[in-house]
Each structure stands twice: as C-alpha cells, then as structure tokens.
C-alpha cells in the first residue's frame, strides 16, 4: 500500500491537506484515530461558511471532500513511523496494515490538561471554555469567571480579554499569586478579583451555577474560562528526530516543513493557538509545499531515467 503522502490526523488541518493533495492527483491517505480535540463542543465558530455547525458536521464534510478527489480516509491509530533509509517512510498502524509513503504530514493536534477540580472536566466544551474567540459571543453579557491554572501567562491574558464580552467578569487566581501591578491592571480593566482556593464547580441540573471556594463561598457564574496546559501529540515527530525548539515544541518553517526531509506538520501539534480555520489553512499550505517536494523528486527521477535510456542531453 504505497502512497505519495500519508497524513496522520483527520482534523481540520489533516483533511484540508488531504483534499489539496487529492486535487493535485497525489495518492494520499488520511489516517484518523477518531478522537478530535473539540468533540465535547456542540458548535464551532469563526470558520467562514461553517459558523455554527457542529464539529462532527465539519469533519464529515471534509472526509467526503477528500474521498471525492480520490483520497483515502482510514480509521486507525498510528503507532510509529520509520524512515527506510531512502526516500520512503513506513507508517505502522495498531492492528492494521503498514503503509509506505514518500512524504508524511503529521496533524495530530494537542491535548488540554485541565486543573483537577470536581465538575470542571464534565462541563468542558459546554459552559467551561478556553477560547473567547470560539465561544465568547455565545456567553456575552453573562456572569463569567476566569479560573487561574498552571498556564499563568495565558490565564492572565485570558482574564483581560474575556472582559470584551461581558461587564461582569470575576477572576479567581486560585493558585496564582498576583503581583501588585497585575492586580491593578485587572481592576482597572473592570475585573473583580476573588481570592481563595477553588474547590469545585457548582453544577446542578446539567448547568453551571457557580464557583465554590474552600471557605464555603459560592460565586454565581454562568460560564467559566480556564487556561489549560497545552501538550502536543508530537510523539511521531520526535520519534522521527524532528528538531524541537527552545519552547519545547517541534520546529517548522512557514509551510510546516520540519527538520527531517519529507516530514511536515500542521495545526495544533506545532501551533497551540491555531483555531479550526487557521489549522485548515496550515494544512493546505503544507500540502502545497509537500507536493512541490515530491515534484522535485519526480523531475530528478525523470532526468535519471531519461539519461539511462541513452539519450544525450
């Protein structure tokens, strides 16, 4: 089962790349483990022409478009990728076939590590949120909380940003110790600061009612934003020896090219802020760059064969 490109990850980045490569008449397979990051969300936003659709609808449409251009979508999980020492990669699936390919695009995304608080994970993607651009408009003018977590810079920025959508924002530093300057900036922004350890979210009748603190207080809130710790699913890339930057993430150029020839990456696996529409664009750009990489190989092979046939150039 030999391909021009195997795309690992069937989200917005991977499917966009698969479609573009199919349109380029490349033999492409998209391998999807079926565990999208945004699965808990009922709607997606900020994606032109798809605003308000469910994530499942977007993925179904993307798969249909990939297959419509001759691409394959394979359900499975990749356990490893190996370079065969020439210009080929071997992609091994759990309990499935081995795929041989000339190029690889990894679009496996990331996972959100949330604070360990009762009620928080169960409401993730509903009324516990992290991206104001994705969900802020839907909770506009509501009582909003911002919960301090391990991702300190992200959380402080998030608190100031969320204020654009509501005049009633409470920041719960929780384990974050604020400096005097940080307190001043948040207060000047019109954000109320409630100190004390957060113990749980008050969830009743399938709805968030508030944030409960260790001293027994419950602050009523209709939605809570939290800053997760973003952990990329980059094991396949690091296993291939792709260079990692000072920030701990795999390094790529503007097209998604890694330090390993023939290996590209796109979407949240190398870009934590990437939204759906950004990831889709990155997948498309990576596909074009990968096609040009294959084109260079095709031309070199054609010249070698031409000369071997005894034609004097």
Please name every model-derived segment:
Residues 1-5, 73-142, 224-227, 250-254, ...:
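FAD-binding core/adjacent interface of flavoenzyme oxidoreductases
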Residues 18-19, 156-160, 266-313:
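A conserved FAD-binding loop/helix module that cradles the flavin
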Residues 122-138, 228-275, 292:
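FAD-site-proximal beta/loop scaffold in flavoenzymes
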Residues 126-133, 146-159, 179-180:
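Active-site glycine-rich loop that binds ribose-phosphate moieties when present
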Residues 3-57, 143, 153-176:
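Beta1-alpha1 glycine-rich phosphate/pyrophosphate-binding loop at the start
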Residues 11-12, 110-112, 151-153, 270:
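Residue-level detector of alpha-helix initiation sites
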Residues 60, 66-93, 98-101, 164-251, ...:
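A Rossmann-like FAD-binding core segment of flavoenzymes
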Residues 23, 27, 33-35, 42-69, ...:
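N-terminal glycine-rich dinucleotide-binding loop that anchors FAD/FMN and/or NAD(P) in oxidoreductases
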């Amino acid at each position: 089962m030999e391909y021009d490109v195997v795309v690992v990850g069937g989200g917005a980045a991977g499917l966009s790349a698969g479609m573009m490569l199919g349109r380029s008449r490349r033999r492409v397979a998209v391998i999807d483990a079926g565990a999208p990051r945004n699965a808990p969300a009922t709607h997606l936003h900020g994606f032109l022409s798809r605003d308000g659709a469910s994530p499942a609808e977007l993925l179904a449409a993307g798969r249909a478009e990939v297959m419509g251009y001759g691409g394959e979508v394979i359900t499975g999980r990749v356990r490893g990728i190996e370079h065969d020492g020439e210009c080929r990669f071997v992609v091994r699936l759990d309990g499935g076939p081995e795929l041989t390919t000339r190029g690889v695009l990894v679009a496996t995304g990331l996972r959100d590590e949330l604070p360990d608080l009762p009620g928080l994970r169960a409401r993730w993607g509903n009324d516990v949120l992290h991206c104001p651009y994705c969900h802020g408009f839907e909770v506009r003018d509501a009582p909003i909380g911002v919960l301090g977590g391990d991702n300190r810079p992200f959380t402080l920025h998030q608190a100031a940003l969320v204020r654009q959508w509501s005049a009633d924002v409470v920041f719960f530093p929780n384990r974050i110790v604020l400096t005097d300057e940080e307190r001043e900036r948040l207060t000047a922004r019109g954000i109320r600061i409630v100190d004390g350890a957060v113990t749980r979210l008050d969830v009743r009748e399938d709805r968030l009612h508030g944030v409960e603190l260790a001293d027994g207080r419950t602050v009523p809130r209709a939605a809570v934003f939290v800053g997760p710790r973003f952990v990329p699913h980059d094991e396949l890339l690091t296993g291939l020896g792709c260079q990692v930057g000072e920030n701990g993430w795999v390094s790529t150029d503007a097209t998604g090219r890694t330090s390993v020839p023939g290996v590209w990456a796109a979407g949240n696996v190398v870009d934590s802020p990437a939204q759906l529409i950004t990831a889709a664009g990155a997948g498309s750009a990576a596909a074009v760059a990968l096609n040009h990489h294959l084109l260079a190989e095709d031309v070199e092979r054609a010249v070698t064969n031409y000369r071997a046939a005894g034609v004097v150039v």
